[in-house]
């Protein structure tokens, strides 16, 4: 194939339509060097600004020389190049994580929105076979995605429909370690695939076909499940066990960097079935939140650096606090004004719950934790509930419960009113 054929494919697919700057992961191998040649030659036609990024893994004697040559190549092409050196104990997984962390740093620094890698169809076959041998979930057998949005960036693999034999033999660096069978992918490439092709000469095409078929099923299920609110457990549990599993797996596709194992997936299923309330980290910065008949999976929110102190309100004063206007002894007008009997003799404290909090009801002291459970108050509301305290005792949990002192005691002690109005934050 000629270079213009690759350009036409890129334009037809519209890979770079949404991007002005793209970072190319440049390893120095044949596939990435040819991708460099195509992208650098046709920057104008593709309407992109190309940035190069290379990781020197420091695993071979030649790697430092290759780094110097890539710097020369970038200078000749008048393109910026960013280079980082891997350190620490080497493994395929650590190296991959290091590379992608570095690429994201480069993208953040340069304002690029696309990361381009030279993965091709042969890589796809190896990946699917590796996942099959490891016993991964069916949806992962669709293989590497041609385009993948991760956070605010898009990973583009424009060579995924081409085999390595489609690339012309141009200047590149040969990684001799690829011939060694120390790593799993190398054993797949050098040993397992050649043996399987003896049984079926079209084995690679067969594997790619299975991957595409699984992808079609995955997309179809996602489309058909659009009308089901999976986060509503009444809806989810109205289906058979098999359908529940498929719907839940499809829901998890929304979080591409979550990647639950089979055991973790089974644990999530069990939590949804057995626990009434639950909030706990699950994996990769995500947490599972369940509140009775609803659940959601979301990124863990960063905590504020400083916690808000409790508010002290004195008699004959007003203050706006966390979406409410509190008026101590000064009447507020309106239909939706809450009124709580209090004493004018001392200040009022407004805060969130603390460990050991109790509320007096019907003459009995009840722990807030038990009260919230009995009233089925969602965890989010428990944490955000405002507590009104006076004389060291809880007078009211705003919108939830009030200290019901006897009428005589109330008349003797509570000689004014705290007026509360809901306002916009």
Swiss-Prot record:
GO molecular function annotation: ATP binding; tRNA(Ile)-lysidine synthase activity
CDD domains registered for this protein in UniProt: TilS_N
Gene Ontology CC terms, in alphabetical order: cytoplasm
Entry binding sites for ATP: 27-32
SMART domains attached to this UniProt entry: TilS_C (SM00977)
UniProt catalytic activity: cytidine(34) in tRNA(Ile2) + L-lysine + ATP = lysidine(34) in tRNA(Ile2) + AMP + diphosphate + H(+)
Database matches in InterPro entries: Lysidine-tRNA-synth_C (IPR012796), Rossmann-like_a/b/a_fold (IPR014729), TilS/TtcA_N (IPR011063), tRNA_Ile_lys_synt (IPR012094), tRNA_Ile_lys_synt_N (IPR012795)
Domain of life: Bacteria
Cellular location(s): Cytoplasm
Keyword ATP-binding in annotation: yes
Main location: cytoplasm
Pfam families in alphabetical order: ATP_bind_3, TilS_C
EC number(s) reported in the record: 6.3.4.19
GO biological process assignments: tRNA modification
HAMAP family according to UniProt: tRNA_Ile_lys_synt (MF_01161)
Family membership: Belongs to the tRNA(Ile)-lysidine synthase family.
UniProt free text on domains: The N-terminal region contains the highly conserved SGGXDS motif, predicted to be a P-loop motif involved in ATP binding.
Reported function: Ligates lysine onto the cytidine present at position 34 of the AUA codon-specific tRNA(Ile) that contains the anticodon CAU, in an ATP-dependent manner. Cytidine is converted to lysidine, thus changing the amino acid specificity of the tRNA from methionine to isoleucine.
UniProt protein name: tRNA(Ile)-lysidine synthase
Organism: Streptococcus pneumoniae (strain ATCC 700669 / Spain 23F-1)
Gene for this chain: tilS
């Amino acid at each position: 194939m000629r270079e213009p054929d690759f350009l036409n494919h890129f334009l037809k697919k519209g890979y770079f339509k949404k991007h002005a700057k793209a970072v190319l992961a440049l390893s120095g191998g044949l596939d990435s060097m040819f991708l460099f040649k195509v992208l650098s030659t046709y920057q104008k036609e593709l309407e992109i600004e190309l940035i190069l990024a290379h990781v020197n893994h420091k695993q071979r004697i030649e790697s430092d020389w290759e780094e110097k040559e890539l710097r020369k190549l970038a200078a000749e092409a008048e393109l910026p190049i960013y280079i980082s050196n891997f350190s620490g104990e080497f493994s395929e997984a650590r190296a991959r994580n290091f590379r992608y962390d570095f690429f994201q740093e480069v993208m953040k620094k340069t304002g690029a929105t696309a990361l381009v890698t030279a993965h091709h169809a042969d890589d796809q076959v190896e990946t699917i076979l590796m996942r099959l041998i490891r016993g991964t979930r069916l949806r992962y057998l669709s293989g590497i995605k041609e385009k993948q949005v991760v956070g605010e960036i898009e990973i583009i693999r424009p060579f995924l429909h081409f085999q390595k034999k489609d690339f012309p033999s141009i200047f590149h660096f040969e990684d001799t370690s690829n011939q060694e069978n120390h790593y799993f992918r190398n054993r797949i490439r050098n040993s397992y695939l050649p043996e399987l092709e003896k049984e079926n000469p079209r084995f690679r095409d067969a594997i790619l076909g299975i991957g595409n078929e699984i992808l079609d099923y995955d997309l179809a299920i996602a489309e058909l499940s659009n009308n089901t609110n999976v986060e509503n457990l009444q809806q989810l549990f109205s289906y058979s066990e098999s359908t529940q599993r498929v719907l839940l797996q499809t829901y998890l596709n929304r979080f591409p960097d979550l990647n639950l194992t089979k055991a973790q997936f089974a644990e999530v299923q069990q939590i949804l079935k057995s626990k009434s309330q639950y909030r706990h980290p699950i994996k990769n910065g995500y947490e599972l939140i369940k509140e009775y008949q609803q659940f959601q999976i979301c990124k863990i929110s960063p905590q504020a650096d400083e916690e808000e102190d409790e508010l002290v309100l004195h008699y004959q004063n007003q203050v706006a606090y966390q979406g409410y206007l509190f008026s101590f002894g000064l009447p507020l007008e309106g239909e939706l004004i809450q009124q709580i009997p209090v004493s004018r003799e001392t200040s009022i404290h407004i805060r969130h719950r603390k460990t050991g909090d109790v509320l007096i009801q019907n003459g009995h002291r009840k722990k807030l934790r038990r009260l919230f459970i009995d009233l089925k108050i969602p965890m989010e509301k428990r944490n955000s509930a405002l507590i009104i305290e006076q004389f060291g005792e809880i007078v009211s949990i705003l919108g939830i419960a009030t200290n019901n002192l006897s009428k005589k005691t109330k008349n003797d002690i509570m000689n004014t009113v705290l007026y509360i109005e809901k306002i916009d934050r």
